[in-house]
Amino acid sequence: MSRVCQVTGKRPVTGNNRSHALNATKRRFLPNLHSHRFWVESEKRFVTLRVSAKGMRVIDKKGIDTVLAELRARGEKY
């Protein structure tokens, strides 16, 4: 399962760990992903999405029906 938010598209990015001596070693910054069940009133069922914390805020703001319509338009399965 890839580490990508289904709502926002956030994915891991790369950067450096910097020690006190400023040595640089590569690292990954991972998105804050959670599998979360959302109740879709129009379909009378639960939908499980892998979303970041920001994705949950987007769903709270726009509504689950609007977000699912955007996912369908992109051709994503949920």
From Swiss-Prot:
Its name, as the record gives it, is Large ribosomal subunit protein bL28
Q: Name one GO biological process term.
A: cytoplasmic translation
The record's section on InterPro entries has: Ribosomal_bL28, Ribosomal_bL28/bL31-like_sf, Ribosomal_bL28_bact-type, Ribosomal_bL28_sf
What family does the database annotate? Belongs to the bacterial ribosomal protein bL28 family.
Organism, per UniProt? Escherichia coli (strain K12)
Q: Which domain of life is it from?
A: Bacteria
Keywords from UniProt, A to Z, are: Ribonucleoprotein, Ribosomal protein, RNA-binding, rRNA-binding
| Oligomer status and interactors | Part of the 50S ribosomal subunit.
Q: Would you name any one GO CC term?
A: cytosolic large ribosomal subunit
A Gene Ontology molecular function term for this protein is:
structural constituent of ribosome
Name of the gene: rpmB
